[in-house]
Amino acid sequence: MFQKSYKILSTEKLNNTTFSFVISCPELAEESWCGRFVNVLCGEKTLRRPISISEIDKQNGTITIVFEVRGDGTKWMSERKAGDELDILGPLGNGFFPDKTKRGIFIGGGIGCPPMLGAAKEYGSDAEVILGFRSQENAILTDKFKSVAKRVEITTNDGTLGAKGFVTDVLKNMVQNGENAVVYACGPTPMLKSVAALCKEKNIKCYVSLEQRMACGIGACLCCCLLY
């Protein structure tokens, strides 16, 4: 785990509220893997903001983070430019390592999609992906997923992009009971509960990355600890 200021190499606005930063942080990138996150200090705010790591480039010493503006802290982040520095603590969290010996299905919902991009890339070109969004205007990273996975299914609540419905509507038709597959998912808690329940019903292994408000990011304050 490291805590220092790292330079932003590039920024991209993905939609009206979502931004992507590529950050130069060689030692942090070297210690990162799928499902981990960083805690970013936002100006004069006391508490850091937890942001998932979307992509990791160990060779070039960079990570990509994708975040949605939800308050003053992330609004401050969205106003940063290439060349600015961010005070970052990380990498944090347990994460996971995709099992390449089994069929890999990666499911992202909303702002839970970015960490699944890095996971699908790590798994390889046989990755299968299901993405869920509220509407077409909320969709992000769809082209990037299509460039790394052999199959990408998209759902929206209102049917403006892909199939109308939820990610579980697609998943239940993609997998057979007890097949040699692993599902990896990140997104809103109701979505994760539905995905986990379906995987349990079909006797398929499932990993979920949980979203939670937190303060320290290392488990000491217990804000991010969930009972299960």
Outline where the language-model segments fall.
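Residues that recognize and position ribonucleotide moieties
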Residues: 1, 214
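FNR/FR-type flavoprotein reductase catalytic core
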Residues: 72-213
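Conserved small/polar residues in nucleotide/adenosyl-binding loops
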Residues: 228
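Short glycine/proline-enriched turns and hinge-like loops at secondary-structure junctions
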Residues: 18, 32-34, 98-100, 219-220
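Ferredoxin-reductase
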Residues: 2-82
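Short cysteine clusters
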Residues: 216, 221-224
